[in-house]
């Protein structure tokens, strides 16, 4: 399954470069979302610092310059996935951070500074559309002459999602609150716990029936590396923090970033968003190749979990997906010695 891992690494590198370049290319449009990216990047750096301190013995011999370089790249990468991913989420009709955005909303003034709201916009906080592409309310629609399409004109009979071109984000209207305000934090927490419990039950049954073993590659890794994979045999504060960090970063990259990127660029909004969920879950599962023997067991475990996390994001936002992933990783770390040879 080495080829699966290579394909995954190439795909991840591709998406990383795309998001970093889009952060630069769309800097005006994504400006209102920078605060979320800086917050996520800072949280990841704090995780990295604590992990380095706790795993100092395992990292002995690694130069300080290498650690600082890796941490700097981690900050840039996660900030790019957060900022651009939140922008794509906005376009696909999602509140990326429903709890955080209610506390720190994107205002019309911020979007006006990004060139995407009219000066006469309301002072109420901006919210994404109920489902799918944003409404045309507030957009200047100039119908072209019959049989003629004027550059920059929005055709009244054009059913393509907005913004359909890279300049269309500059004319985004003030958007309405999505039709999910009735979802309360207790409901989100309840759904999160149900997803975690279901994923753990499925994992226990699958591993009990198939009796997998750690692959030769994983057995040769250090405690720091195996903890990053959630396969360490020793549960300590260091390994717990590390699996939480991995879950946090993976949800930002896959569910917030790649999933919304696919939804926008392949027009998988609305009911078709489930296609983006499945595609992202498949890519995420490929990243876990080579951990167990036989290899298919890990893929069979991870793909359904990815579907559940994708649904959780779609329904309750990235905070719920991050919490579910973190709890699943912690529980998996505890259960690993009894489930895997």
Which residue ranges define each predicted feature?
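A generic, lipid-embedded transmembrane alpha helix
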Residues: 37-59
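Alpha-helical transmembrane spans of integral membrane proteins, capturing the lipid-embedded, hydrophobic core
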Residues: 8-15, 41-45, 78-83, 192-204, ...
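Juxtamembrane helix-loop-helix connectors linking adjacent transmembrane helices
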Residues: 59-76, 92-125, 130-140, 145-247, ...
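Membrane-interface helix-boundary motifs at transmembrane edges
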Residues: 25-36, 266-271
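Feature marks short, highly hydrophobic, charge-poor N-terminal signal-anchor/signal peptide-like helices
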Residues: 1-8
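Juxtamembrane "helix-exit" motif on the non-cytosolic side of transmembrane helices
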Residues: 24-25, 52-63, 208, 289-290
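N-terminal signal-anchor/start-transfer transmembrane helix
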Residues: 9-28
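Transmembrane helix-loop-helix hairpins at the membrane interface
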Residues: 232-341
């Amino acid at each position: 399954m080495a080829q699966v891992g290579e394909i995954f690494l190439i795909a991840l590198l591709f998406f990383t470069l795309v998001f970093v370049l889009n952060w630069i290319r769309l800097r005006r449009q994504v400006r209102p979302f920078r605060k979320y990216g800086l917050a996520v990047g800072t949280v990841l750096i704090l995780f990295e610092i604590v992990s380095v301190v706790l795993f100092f013995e395992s990292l002995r011999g690694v130069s300080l310059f290498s650690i600082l370089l890796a941490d700097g790249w981690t900050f840039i990468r996660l900030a790019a996935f957060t900022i651009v991913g939140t922008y794509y989420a906005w376009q696909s009709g999602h509140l990326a951070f429903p709890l955080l955005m209610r506390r720190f909303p994107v205002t019309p003034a911020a979007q006006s500074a990004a060139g995407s709201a009219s000066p006469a916009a309301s002072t109420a906080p901006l919210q994404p559309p109920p489902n799918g592409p944003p409404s045309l309310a507030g957009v200047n629609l100039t119908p072209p002459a019959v049989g003629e399409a004027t550059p920059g004109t929005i055709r009244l009979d054009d059913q393509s999602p907005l913004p359909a071109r890279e300049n269309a984000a500059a004319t985004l209207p003030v958007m309405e609150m999505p039709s999910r305000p009735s979802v309360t934090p207790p409901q989100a927490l309840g759904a999160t716990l149900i997803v975690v419990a279901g994923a753990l039950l499925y994992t226990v049954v699958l591993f009990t029936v198939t009796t997998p073993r750690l692959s030769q590659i994983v057995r040769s890794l250090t405690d720091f590396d195996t903890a990053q994979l959630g396969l360490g045999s020793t549960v300590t504060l260091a390994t717990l923090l590390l699996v939480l960090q991995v879950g946090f970063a993976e949800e930002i990259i896959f569910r917030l970033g790649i999933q919304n990127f696919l939804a926008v660029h392949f027009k998988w909004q609305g009911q078709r968003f489930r296609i983006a969920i499945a595609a992202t879950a498949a890519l995420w599962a490929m990243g876990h190749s080579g951990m167990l023997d036989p290899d298919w067991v890990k893929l069979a475990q991870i793909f359904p979990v990815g579907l559940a996390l994708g649904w959780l994001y779609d329904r309750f936002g990235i905070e719920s997906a991050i919490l579910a992933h973190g709890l699943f990783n912690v529980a998996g770390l505890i259960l690993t010695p009894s489930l895997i040879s």
